[in-house]
């Protein structure tokens, strides 16, 4: 069995193809396919099964070589006696046994089992699926094919293409034969002319038959052109070699081009399937595209499009367009229109020109057909695909005519087309593109993948040639690839089978690409050609896809392929198959032969490819796989679904993938190349799967099957995309055997398949429990990813996906689905006709297999995905989001930028790379995970990835792609990879990653994950979505679902699965979905963190988390699943994160640790995030994921970046990017690891980590620290850097952050990403946070934040979005705060825990923070570590990052994270957070509750902590302390504080860090830190801030400034100080500050002040300075410092804020810092604001500040007291208290640190009043916080201004000038509302950020404020620049100034406990963020008891959920209660009550 040889992927396959080719093919031609689903071993892969005995074993000589440790040398034998007989499976006495999954059956030695089509098999722990291929029939055709081969051989030139035309005809014939294609054939011919017209080439080839040629020609030319070969044949040939060369070149080229093209293609593909083609065409030559389009459109559409297919076409088209790839597949079926198809093929061929075209041309007959089909198809497909409609139309026409035939054709075409298309053009470049496309196309990702794949493909292509050559030497000779392809097709068609196969190989390559590109179409193409293509595709796909996506996809496809092989196409398009039956048969035979072989080969190839590509792919695949998987699937789905979005997503993904791939490639390149060639690398195997594809060349045939699969898969991918239907379908698929067949015929099938695939995967996964869930998530995520991307796209996408999927699905689905169904129905016949039966079976089998594979893949992918998802999701999401946002393009730019950065990073990362690589590998490996050390790394990476993913995703992501991306970059290499993996594509890295990540990330980051994801902002919602926004927040699960929105959607759709999936990551993903996945993914990261922290953190987190968990739980649970910790989600997250993370992390961590530290970071970060995230838990978690990721990535990324970046610069970029990226990336990157390595420092580095590390590190991180520490070191420096970075970020970040923060956030998103990165990154935490932040945001939004969190990716994205938005910020805010809170909580929790510890943290934090930090610090580290680390890290980290991030996110997260750290603070903050939550309380409550409860708990803890820790007293005190400002502080503070606090905390930590941190936060952090700074400041802040801090006002001002400044200064100083850290000490001192407590209020403050004074020493510097500046601050600071802690804590937050103040002196710096902070804040002002506002909010605060300043302070205290009282008031507090306690407890838990800290702090802190206050304070704080916030804000604002360290956040506007002004004036860009002190916008808008800022009472200013301030050289008083928008004020009947005034006086929702149902818009996470910012408490679940001021906000669709509230008499209100109420600052529930009548009527 050549099959065995196949193992030699390339050579073997070639040989196989070649040799086998010669044989008529039965032999040669695979009769079945064994799809190995993606798993921890690698991406999905298809192995062709030939007649005779196919040995499955570990030995290379085995037909199905599975080089995995669990597989025996000769594990089992699959004996196929005849193509029409069921294969017999026998176990060969393997050690781990062989089992049949459905029904369950264990095969004992000697026991025989007859395999049914699509039966799921488990070899040891490797899930596979058998697909029957319908090969034989095609044999006859093959003869001609063979002939074709000759032409091909001879031809190799375009002219030969004519042959193709002939072939096409023949093919058509075959098709016709099979299907009625003949008529279509004619049509085809006719169509072809159209094609011709379309394609210039065609004209030359004018003749009808030649048309095919023409098409080919056209394509060829195009391709040629593309390749530059100029002539198709030549080109093909040349290209072929070129491909090889080009491959690499392309890879490079393609990377760029890819990027470019990819972008274009992606975009286009995304937008249309076309893109891929377009890209290819574009790349190749527009003509091709045109051709394709024309053909497709003209031909196809004109032809029959009009026909019913119009409809289909339309849907297809639309879907096609939208889904394009997916749809494409569907369309492809239509495309099948054999005639058209042929035409298409030709065109495709043309398009593919290169190999396919040429091959096709050469192949002419069969080849031609195929080629044409392929070529045309590809081209067409791409176009068509892009615009499946066209194709579909055509196809449809034909399809309608010959629905079956069409399907087949379509399939074939699709496959072929994509294949060819890519192959031709892509063959060389296109192919890779195609591959990429394919992968991407698969969904929209095709493009991405394509690019990546392209690159891979190139390599592969090189391989391909081999295969093709083998197969069709002539072909080979000719550009075999193409020729090969052709040949294969030919072969397939006829004896040409071989050629076909070869062709397939070549074509496959191309096709794969194309296929991927136009997966839907590919299906068609696939059918005929797709066999080959399929095989290829899978291979390529796998490889390209990162395997994952594709893998899953591919595998699905592959899985499908096998069936589809012959049937795969069918499967893919069962319809196609059926349609293609004739062709299919040919193909089938071919396929069978090829398929089996190919499949087999493919599988192997896939594996090999994975290996080879693996090397590349590994990363890519792993990454991609991971990422892609998610993406792939998701993307696929996403893309497919969202074409546009998908495109973006795809792009993102693609980018990610590509990047990944690239990186991977780089990484793996050796491997890839070698591996590629040596597909053997087992290691690569994993990758292999991915690589396999590459290898697939030889395996071409197999590949073909694979490809078929692939296309099918693509389709499946697509399908998965359509999880809903698809899912159903998928299952249906199984179910639908016959129907399936029909379905198969229908694209639907594939789609279904896809969906099914997804679902099954989902289910499967779920069933499997595979974590892959994330992948599943992918599935869901398909949605998820989609979500990610989708999500990113968010709801839209999800929607799209869902919608699309629904729409898409709907559109596609409906149409597609419906269409497919209908189509299927229609098609079925043909399929049936076609032998759909068998085929159908196969298809179904394939599908099954696919699904299985998908499952496996998904699973794996999920993991990957998870990672990716996270990343992807996150990233994707984010990416998507961002991408979506703009990001796409922007992204691209950014990508480039990122690429640079990445490169830089990469370089930098390089070192990390290795490690990172490992790490990356990890993610990437992820798949392999083991592979490489990746194990740990992988774990880490994976974790990271995952985490990242989670995080990322980046968000991934993605989210945070940017960040992640960057990070990824940094990490990149590894991380990216990881990230990429996670992020998806970091590896691919640069570009891809960038793009992907970036995209992803971007989206996440900028993007998302979110992202993820992707993601929400755009997706935000969804993006935030990411799940995030999604709903994630909503409820996690639910929210998640919503969040998931897409996810949920999916989730919903899939929920179950998703859920199931979810549970695994997906759940996360799903539920948390995003978050979770991220979390999950992130988790890992968190684990990182955790791990790092793990112990503590984890526990801490966990504990804390736990509470958060609670809320989280659901999320958690997803998380749980993910986390598993589930409930504990936080825990989970924490745990999970920690645990998971831990464990995941652990390994990861470990690695990371070392690695990372990162881990640390990661952990930390993640932790942070996690905490944060977790805290946010849901969000958090998501965040977490995100966060972590961010965190990590952040850190790492950042880190890396930082590190690299530390490079800061890059980092900035990175960070920025990474921020986002990181986030996303980070997310992925998260990888942190890389970060870790570096990063950490960097991030942790920066972020906190570093500092944190320092501090935290020391402290929490200590451990981390440790790791980190060093890092810290760095960090310090870097951190510092961080600071800078942070700051940097700040700067950049600012930019970024700003950008990111805002802009970016939005658009920037990317930047944001960046920003986030920076901040975020810092954020990292932030991101995390951010995410968190976002989360916060989201959460703030919380929902949003949450979402954000989730979003994180989203956040990230959102981040961007959220982030951006983050606005969400709110999220951040909220989240930040909320998040913070939430996150906080969780974070808190963790943080709390940590944070809580935070408490200690506070204490610690304060103390801890400071002390702790300082002293505790260590402990903290410990604890913090735990939490802290988490917190610390997170917090700190976050903080630091958080800081930055933290600041921003930081703030938020920071808070959160920080928070965590602060979290505690937050907590306190949480309170703050809560506050943040603001609601903190509420939120806490609410969320707190919800979380609060849990959060509360958490929150409490948090608050508590803060309180407690805050020293509670501190916090509380502080908190209460005005810190309450806390309130503000708290909330604001919390948030800010929180953030800040965290910062403080962190700072604290950081601070200690302080120095570092502080410093770290230091400024940079400042940014972050501001937060960080906070941290730093914190320290100082702490100190000052603290003192001041609270002074918050000062802080604000001071704080802000101070804080900021301080931070800055402090930072600096602090740094010193922190050093002082001590400051901390002061803190401690301050701490003692008991007075603090006392002072607490005044005294505290005062004390603080005084203390500060004391502190001043150190502080003084900054503090002092600031103080002076801040004046109050100073004192405050000092006191604060002293108090610091507490205050700090409390104040911390506040302090932070305040701190900031102190910075004043520093201020200047601080400004910087603040800037940073601001920056962080993004809004500088905001920060200020927040600070200010917050401060103001607290008037008390203010006073506080004053206090700090002392005057106020009394006041503040007073207020604080009041607040405090309030707080007490807030009973929540109590809970908080308890929580606090908990926190305290946690402290213990966290304890350790915390405890220590706690002890210290606690005592002091606690004692500090705190206690009493705690509860109270907490609440108070919370409340106050909220209120405070405003107050603070307000105050802050003033001070801030004064303080000069405003943390400015932008919403609705992207003002690079303004961002620069902020940074130049020493302010920072806030990443979330939570950490912002000023919100800058151009008009009144009801965005989450705007409402959160208004709720917090922070100044909402016009752009003129910044411009005038820039002119004045300092921040001008905001009062004169409040936004004026008479029109809107009139519309809404309110006055903004009055509303702000009321918000500062009192939190609008103080005392309110609000539950938001999942269907509400904005999503619950965002609503939660708003609620938190307004002082309300978010109830995570439906209240079960009555309580005054407890209300439920719902919408008509959720009325059924509101029976309980109605029964209880709880007011059930419309969302306008919040939206309008917050805008007017009037709480009038009675005016918005929804009556039972309305409900009933609804």
Swiss-Prot record:
Gene3D superfamilies, sorted: 2.60.200.20, BRCT domain (3.40.50.10190)
Biased composition, class Pro residues, residue ranges: 201-210, 1421-1432, 1462-1473, 1657-1678
Free-text note regarding domains: Tandemly repeated BRCT domains are characteristic of proteins involved in DNA damage signaling. In MDC1, these repeats are required for localization to chromatin which flanks sites of DNA damage marked by 'Ser-139' phosphorylation of H2AX.
Biased composition (Polar residues): 649-660, 943-956, 1326-1340, 1390-1408, 1474-1491, 1515-1529, 1584-1603
Function: Histone reader protein required for checkpoint-mediated cell cycle arrest in response to DNA damage within both the S phase and G2/M phases of the cell cycle. Specifically recognizes and binds histone H2AX phosphorylated at 'Ser-139', a marker of DNA damage, serving as a scaffold for the recruitment of DNA repair and signal transduction proteins to discrete foci of DNA damage sites. Also required for downstream events subsequent to the recruitment of these proteins. These include phosphorylation and activation of the ATM, CHEK1 and CHEK2 kinases, and stabilization of TP53/p53 and apoptosis.
Entry comment on modification after translation: Phosphorylated upon exposure to ionizing radiation (IR), ultraviolet radiation (UV), and hydroxyurea (HU). Phosphorylation in response to IR requires ATM, NBN, and possibly CHEK2. Also phosphorylated during the G2/M phase of the cell cycle and during activation of the mitotic spindle checkpoint. Phosphorylation at Thr-4 by ATM stabilizes and enhances homodimerization via the FHA domain. Phosphorylated at Ser-168 and Ser-195 by CK2 in response to DNA damage during mitosis, promoting interaction with TOPBP1. Ubiquitinated by RNF4, leading to proteasomal degradation; undergoes 'Lys-48'-linked polyubiquitination.
SMART domains per the UniProt record, alphabetical: FHA (SM00240)
Region annotated Interaction with CHEK2, chain positions: 1-150
Source organism of the structure: Sus scrofa
Name of the protein described by the UniProt record: Mediator of DNA damage checkpoint protein 1
GO CC field: chromosome; nucleus; site of double-strand break
Region (Interaction with the PRKDC complex): 1137-1580
UniProt keyword Cytoplasm, yes or no: no
All residue ranges annotated as the BRCT domain in the record: 1845-1923, 1944-2035
Keywords assigned by UniProt, alphabetized: Acetylation, Cell cycle, Chromosome, DNA damage, DNA repair, Isopeptide bond, Methylation, Nucleus, Phosphoprotein, Repeat, Ubl conjugation
Gene transcribed to yield this protein: MDC1
Quaternary structure (record): Homodimer. Interacts with H2AX, which requires phosphorylation of H2AX on 'Ser-139'. Interacts with the MRN complex, composed of MRE11, RAD50, and NBN. Interacts with CHEK2, which requires ATM-mediated phosphorylation of 'Thr-68' within the FHA domain of CHEK2. Interacts constitutively with the BRCA1-BARD1 complex, SMC1A and TP53BP1. Interacts with ATM and FANCD2, and these interactions are reduced upon DNA damage. Also interacts with the PRKDC complex, composed of XRCC6/KU70, XRCC5/KU80 and PRKDC/XRCC7.
């Amino acid at each position: 069995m050549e099959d065995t040889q196949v193992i030699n992927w390339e050579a073997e396959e070639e040989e196989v193809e070649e040799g086998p080719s010669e044989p008529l093919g039965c032999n040669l031609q695979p009769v079945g396919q064994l799809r190995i689903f993606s798993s921890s071993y690698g991406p999905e892969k298809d192995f062709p099964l030939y007649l005779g005995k196919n040995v499955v074993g570990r030995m290379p000589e085995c037909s199905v070589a599975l080089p995995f440790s669990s597989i025996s040398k000769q594990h089992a034998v699959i004996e196929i006696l005849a193509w029409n007989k069921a294969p017999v499976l026998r176990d060969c006495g393997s050690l781990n046994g062989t089992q049949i999954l459905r029904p369950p059956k264990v095969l004992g030695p000697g026991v025989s089992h007859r395999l049914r089509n699509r039966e799921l098999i488990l070899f040891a722990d490797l899930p596979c699926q058998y697909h029957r291929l319908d090969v034989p029939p095609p044999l006859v055709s093959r003869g001609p094919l063979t002939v074709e081969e000759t032409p091909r051989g001879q031809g190799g030139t375009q002219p030969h293409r004519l042959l193709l035309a002939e072939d096409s005809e023949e093919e058509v014939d075959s098709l016709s034969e099979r299907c009625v294609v003949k008529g279509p054939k004619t049509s085809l011919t006719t169509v072809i002319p159209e094609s011709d017209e379309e394609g210039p080439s065609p004209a030359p080839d004018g003749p009808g038959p030649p048309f095919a040629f023409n098409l080919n020609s056209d394509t060829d030319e195009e391709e040629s052109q593309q390749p530059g070969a100029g002539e198709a044949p030549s080109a093909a040939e040349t290209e072929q070699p070129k491909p090889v060369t080009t491959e690499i070149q392309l890879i490079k080229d393609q990377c760029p081009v890819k990027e470019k093209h990819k972008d274009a293609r992606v975009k286009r593909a995304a937008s249309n399937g076309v893109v891929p083609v377009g890209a290819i065409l574009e790349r190749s030559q527009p003509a091709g595209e045109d051709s394709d389009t024309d053909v497709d459109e003209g031909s196809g559409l004109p032809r029959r499009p009009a026909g019913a297919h119009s409809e289909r076409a339309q849907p297809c088209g639309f879907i096609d367009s939208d889904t394009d790839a997916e749809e494409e597949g569907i369309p492809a079926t239509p495309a099948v229109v054999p005639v058209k198809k042929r035409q298409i093929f030709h065109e495709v061929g043309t398009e593919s020109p290169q190999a396919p075209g040429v091959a096709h041309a050469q192949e002419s007959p069969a080849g031609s057909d195929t080629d044409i089909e392929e070529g045309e198809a590809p081209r067409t497909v791409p176009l068509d695909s892009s615009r499946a409609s066209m194709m579909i139309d055509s196809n449809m026409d034909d399809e309608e005519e010959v629905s079956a035939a069409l399907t087949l054709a379509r399939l074939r075409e699709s496959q072929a087309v994509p294949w060819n298309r890519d192959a031709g053009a892509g063959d060389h470049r296109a192919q890779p593109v195609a591959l990429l496309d394919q992968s991407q196309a698969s969904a929209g990702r095709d493009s991405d993948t394509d690019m990546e794949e392209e690159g891979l493909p190139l390599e592969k292509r090189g391989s391909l040639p081999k295969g093709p050559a083998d197969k069709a030497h002539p072909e080979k000779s000719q550009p075999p690839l193409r020729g090969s392809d052709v040949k294969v097709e030919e072969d397939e068609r006829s004896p040409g089978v071989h050629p076909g196969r070869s062709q397939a190989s070549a074509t496959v390559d191309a096709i794969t690409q194309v296929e991927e590109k136009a997966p839907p179409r590919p299906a068609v193409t696939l059918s005929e050609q797709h066999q080959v293509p399929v095989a290829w595709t899978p291979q390529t796909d796998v490889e390209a896809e990162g395997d994952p996506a594709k893998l899953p996809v591919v595998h699905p496809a592959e899985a499908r392929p096998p069936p589809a092989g012959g049937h795969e196409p069918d499967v893919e398009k069962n319809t196609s198959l059926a349609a293609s039956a004739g062709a299919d048969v040919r193909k089938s035979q071919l396929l069978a032969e090829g398929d089996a072989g190919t499949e087999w080969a493919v599988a192997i190839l896939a594996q090999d490819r994975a290996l080879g590509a693996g090397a590349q792919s590994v990363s890519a695949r792993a990454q991609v796989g991971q990422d892609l998987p998610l993406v792939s699937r998701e993307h696929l789905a996403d893309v497919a679904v969202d074409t546009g979005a998908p495109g973006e997503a795809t792009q993102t993904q693609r980018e990610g993938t590509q990047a990944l791939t690239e990186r991977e490639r780089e990484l793996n390149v050796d491997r890839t190349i070698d591996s590629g060639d040596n597909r053997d690398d087992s290691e690569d195997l994993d990758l292999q799967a991915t690589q396999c594809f590459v290898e697939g060349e030889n395996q071409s045939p197999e590949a073909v099957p694979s490809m078929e699969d692939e296309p099918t898969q693509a389709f499946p991918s697509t399908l998965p995309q359509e999880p809903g239907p698809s899912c159903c379908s998928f299952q249906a698929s199984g179910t639908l055997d016959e129907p399936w067949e029909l379905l198969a015929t229908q694209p639907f099938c594939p789609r279904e398949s896809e969906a099914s695939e997804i679902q099954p995967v989902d289910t499967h996964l779920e069933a499997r429990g595979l974590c892959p869930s994330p992948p599943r998530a992918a599935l869901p995520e398909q949605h998820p990813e989609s979500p990610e991307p989708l999500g990113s796209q968010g709801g839209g996408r999800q929607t799209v996906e869902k919608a699309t999927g629904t729409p898409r699905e709907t559109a596609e689905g409906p149409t597609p689905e419906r269409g497919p169904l209908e189509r299927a129905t229609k098609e079925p016949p043909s399929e049936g006709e076609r032998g759909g039966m068998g085929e159908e079976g196969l298809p179904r089998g394939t599908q099954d297999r696919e699904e299985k594979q998908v499952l496996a893949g998904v699973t794996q992918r999920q993991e990957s995905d998870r990672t990716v998802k996270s990343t992807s999701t996150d990233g994707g999401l984010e990416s998507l989001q961002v991408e979506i946002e703009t990001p796409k393009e922007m992204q691209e730019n950014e990508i480039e930028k990122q690429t640079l950065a990445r490169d830089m990073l990469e370089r930098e990362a390089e070192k990390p790379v290795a490690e990172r690589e490992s790490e990356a590998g990890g993610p990437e490996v992820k798949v392999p995970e083991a592979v490489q050390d990746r194990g740990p790394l992988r774990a880490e990476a994976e974790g990271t990835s995952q985490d990242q993913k989670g995080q990322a995703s980046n968000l991934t992501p993605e989210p945070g792609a940017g960040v992640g991306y960057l990070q990824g970059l940094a990490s990149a290499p590894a991380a990216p990879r990881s990230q990429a993996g996670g992020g998806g594509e970091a590896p691919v890295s640069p570009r891809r990653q960038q793009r992907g990540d970036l995209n992803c990330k971007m989206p996440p980051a900028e993007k998302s994950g979110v992202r993820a994801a992707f993601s929400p902002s755009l997706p935000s919602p969804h993006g935030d979505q990411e799940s995030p926004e999604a709903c994630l927040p909503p409820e996690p699960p639910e929210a998640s679902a919503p969040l998931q929105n897409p996810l949920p959607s999916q989730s919903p759709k899939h929920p179950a699965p998703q859920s199931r999936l979810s549970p695994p990551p997906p759940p996360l993903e799903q539920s948390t979905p995003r978050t979770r996945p991220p979390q999950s993914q992130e988790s890992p990261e968190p684990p990182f963190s955790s791990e790092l922290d793990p112990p503590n953190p984890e526990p801490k987190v966990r504990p804390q988390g736990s509470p958060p968990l609670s809320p989280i739980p659901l999320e958690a649970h997803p998380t749980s699943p993910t986390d598993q910790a589930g409930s504990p989600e936080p825990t989970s997250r924490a745990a999970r994160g920690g645990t998971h993370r831990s464990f995941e992390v652990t390994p990861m961590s470990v690695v990371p640790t070392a690695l990372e530290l990162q881990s640390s970071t990661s952990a930390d970060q993640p932790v942070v995030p996690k905490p944060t995230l977790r805290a946010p838990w849901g969000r958090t978690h998501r965040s977490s994921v995100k966060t972590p990721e961010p965190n990590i990535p952040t850190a790492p990324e950042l880190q890396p970046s930082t590190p690299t970046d530390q490079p800061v610069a890059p980092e900035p970029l990175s960070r920025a990017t990474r921020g986002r990226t990181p986030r996303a990336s980070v997310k992925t990157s998260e990888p942190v690891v890389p970060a870790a390595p570096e990063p950490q420092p960097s991030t942790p580095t920066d972020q906190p980590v570093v500092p944190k590390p320092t501090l935290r590190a020391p402290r929490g991180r200590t451990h981390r620290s440790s790791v980190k520490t060093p890092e810290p070191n760095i960090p310090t420096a870097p951190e510092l850097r961080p600071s800078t970075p942070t700051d940097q970020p700040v700067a950049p970040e600012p930019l970024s952050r700003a950008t990111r923060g805002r802009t970016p956030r939005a658009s920037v998103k990317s930047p944001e990403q960046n920003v986030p990165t920076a901040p975020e990154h810092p954020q990292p935490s932030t991101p995390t946070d951010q995410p968190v932040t976002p989360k916060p945001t989201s959460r703030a939004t919380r929902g949003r934040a949450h979402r954000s969190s989730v979003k994180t990716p989203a956040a990230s994205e959102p981040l961007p979005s959220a982030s951006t938005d983050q606005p969400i910020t709110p999220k951040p805010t909220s989240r930040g705060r909320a998040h913070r809170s939430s996150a906080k909580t969780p974070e808190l929790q963790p943080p709390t825990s940590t944070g809580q510890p935070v408490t200690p943290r506070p204490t610690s934090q304060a103390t801890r923070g400071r002390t702790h930090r300082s002293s505790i610090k260590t402990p903290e580290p410990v604890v913090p570590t735990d939490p802290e680390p988490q917190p610390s890290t997170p917090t700190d980290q976050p903080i630091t990052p958080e800081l930055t991030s933290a600041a921003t996110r930081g703030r938020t997260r920071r808070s959160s994270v920080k928070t965590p750290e602060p979290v505690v603070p937050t907590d306190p903050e949480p309170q703050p957070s809560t506050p943040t939550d603001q609601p903190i309380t509420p939120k806490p409550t609410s969320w707190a509750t919800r979380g609060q409860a849990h959060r509360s708990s958490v929150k409490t803890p948090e608050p508590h902590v803060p309180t407690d820790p805050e020293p509670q007293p501190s916090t509380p005190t502080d908190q209460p302390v005005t810190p309450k400002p806390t309130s503000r502080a708290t909330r604001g503070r919390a948030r800010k504080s929180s953030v800040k606090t965290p910062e403080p905390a962190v700072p604290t930590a950081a601070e200690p860090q302080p120095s570092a941190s502080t410093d770290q936060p230091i400024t940079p952090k400042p940014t972050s830190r501001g937060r960080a700074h906070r941290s730093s400041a914190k320290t100082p802040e702490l100190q000052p801030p603290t003192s001041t801090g609270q002074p918050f006002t000062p802080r604000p001002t001071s704080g802000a400034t101070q804080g900021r400044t301080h931070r800055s200064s402090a930072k600096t100083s602090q740094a010193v100080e922190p050093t002082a850290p001590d400051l901390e000490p002061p803190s401690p001192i301050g701490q003692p500050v008991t007075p603090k407590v006392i002072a607490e209020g005044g005294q505290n403050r005062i004390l603080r002040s005084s203390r500060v004074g004391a502190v001043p020493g150190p502080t003084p510097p900054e503090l002092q300075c600031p103080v002076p500046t801040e004046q109050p601050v100073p004192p405050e600071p000092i006191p604060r410092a002293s108090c610091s802690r507490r205050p700090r804590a409390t104040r911390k937050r506040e302090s932070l804020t305040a701190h900031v103040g102190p910075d004043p002196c520093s201020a200047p710096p601080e400004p910087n810092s603040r800037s940073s902070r601001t920056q962080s804040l993004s809004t500088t002002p905001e920060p200020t604001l927040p600070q200010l506002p917050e401060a103001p909010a607290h008037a008390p605060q203010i006073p506080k500040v004053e206090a700090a300043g002392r005057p106020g302070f009394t006041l503040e205290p007073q207020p604080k007291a009041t607040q405090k009282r309030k707080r007490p008031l807030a009973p929540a507090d109590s809970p908080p208290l308890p929580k606090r306690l908990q926190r305290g407890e946690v402290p213990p838990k966290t304890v350790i640190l915390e405890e220590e800290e706690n002890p210290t702090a606690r005592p002091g802190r606690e004692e500090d009043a705190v206690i009493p206050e705690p509860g109270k304070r907490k609440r108070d704080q919370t409340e106050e916080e909220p209120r405070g916030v405003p107050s603070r804000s307000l105050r802050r604002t003033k001070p801030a201004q004064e303080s000069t360290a405003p943390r400015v956040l932008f919403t609705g506007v992207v003002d690079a000038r303004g961002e620069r002004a902020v940074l130049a004036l020493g302010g920072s860009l806030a990443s979330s509302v939570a950490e912002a002190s000023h919100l800058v916008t151009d008009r009144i808008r009801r965005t989450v950020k705007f409402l959160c800022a208004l709720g917090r009472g922070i100044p909402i200013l016009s752009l003129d404020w910044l411009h005038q301030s820039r002119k004045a050289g300092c921040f001008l008083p905001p009062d004169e620049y409040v936004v004026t928008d008479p029109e809107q004020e009139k519309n809404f009947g309110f006055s903004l100034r009055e509303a702000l005034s009321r918000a500062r006086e009192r939190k609008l929702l103080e005392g309110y406990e609000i539950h938001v149902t999942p269907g509400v818009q904005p999503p619950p996470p965002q609503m939660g963020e708003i609620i938190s910012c307004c002082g309300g408490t978010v109830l995570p679940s439906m209240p079960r008891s009555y309580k005054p001021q407890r209300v439920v906000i719902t919408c008509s669709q959720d009325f059924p959920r509101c029976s309980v509230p109605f029964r209880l008499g709880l007011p059930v209100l419309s969302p306008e209660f919040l939206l309008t109420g917050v805008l007017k600052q009037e709480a009038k529930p009675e005016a918005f009550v929804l009556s039972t009548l309305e409900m009933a009527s609804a």
